[in-house]
């Protein structure tokens, strides 16, 4: 069985390579230098190829240099004019990490290479790609309909296309699925899981030593996947594992509450019993929402305020969820969910999720 694939040096494509080898494929990989800031991933890809060869798996590996063209593209991954956004993987600002038409370019090269292998070796060839469901929200070129359409276009534009097919084994899975399958593949192949994944890079903003930041959206998704399988990530982070895990869990909760209208558990938030002088700003956009002189201990388990800041202009929306009639409050600038407003005999009570707030210390 024959397969070609793109090996970025990240955990998704590395997991895919393990899967293909465990299933008995002869694999050829192409890694792309497209002017990405996180070029350390190319070194990690080479390190894993060397590790595989040392253990008896002769994987063909090529590197294509597209940097002279793609470094001109408008993206935080390639342009020094943009900072890499931080936070949850599905937050809107992560669209800055989209490289226009990247996967179409990569897939086109892979398709041409697959056809060449098919004709040279007189065999059918699978183009395997590590795209997964976690990519769908931000990256249109990681969605199944994209590959269905581009596969049809390539077939129309080439001879012998019946010998080439696309395989997207993780299209309905996520990074946790990739890691769980990689554990099985490593056992099958007699490889050390931690060694393989220490030789990967997922971070879009590693430091000069190649250590992962733990703060980019891709980092957060990876950290949560390792946490889900009950293992510490073997890759080196700038901060200790327990700290990057805490940060990732916080980013996940913040996204769930502010963008998906979830509620943090009572008595667990940072600001429930917090009574220092200062302002409470929206954790998403920074708008000042409340001031400490209006904060009081209601005993409900969430930060409570009797009034909003004079310029907050917090939105009030009727909420009929859970069989109740309530007033939801949202940030007027970024439309993030904050909590609810209750009108009680003692006066109004803004019941706010701590995770939605950032505190700015100082006298009012």
Residue ranges and their predicted role:
Residues 248-364:
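A short Gly-Trp-Pro
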Residues 66, 205, 307:
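Active-site donor-binding loop signature of nucleotide-sugar glycosyltransferases
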Residues 108, 202-224, 280-289, 335-336, ...:
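Local cysteine-cluster metal-coordination motifs and their immediate loop/turn environment
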Residues 135, 226-227, 358:
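Glycine-rich nucleotide phosphate-binding loop and flanking beta-alpha elements
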Residues 1-193, 219:
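ATP-dependent adenylation/nucleotidyltransferase module used to activate substrates
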Residues 38-40, 72, 138, 230, ...:
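Generic domain-boundary/flexible-linker signal
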Residues 11, 36, 131, 211, ...:
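Gly/Ser/Thr-rich helix-start
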Residues 1-7, 11, 15-19, 23-28, ...:
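Peripheral terminal appendages
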